[in-house]
């Protein structure tokens, strides 16, 4: 099993009052990928980090193998969710796989 962690910050143009709705949509759609993407076992979405954090939101996933990370990254369902609910609103992506 491997973990794939991705963290982002919201773009400056995103209004504070819009962030809760965006976080909810991200979480719902990212969690819905379990069962659709081969090798993707679990999805946790961190929407409320403590104030010492350097990023606004995080995605913590567990996959069966390291090779499944590449499958996940290119899977059409993941790309659709990322392009619709995540990428338009975020910047400063950081990733750690282990």
Model-predicted regions and their roles:
Residues 1-56, 64-74, 98:
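Short S/T/G/P-rich N-terminal loop/turn motif that feeds into the first structured element of a domain
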Residues 63-94:
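C-terminal structural segments of small proteins and small subunits
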């Amino acid at each position: 099993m491997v973990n794939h962690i991705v963290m982002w910050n919201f773009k400056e143009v995103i209004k504070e009052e819009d962030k809760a709705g965006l976080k909810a949509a991200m979480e719902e759609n990212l969690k819905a990928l379990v069962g659709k993407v081969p090798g993707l076992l679990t999805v946790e979405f961190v929407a409320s980090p403590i104030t010492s954090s350097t990023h606004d939101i995080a995605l913590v996933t567990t996959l069966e193998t390291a090779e499944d990370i590449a499958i996940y990254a290119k899977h059409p369902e993941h790309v659709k969710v990322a392009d619709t609910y995540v990428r338009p609103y975020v910047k400063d992506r950081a990733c750690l796989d282990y």
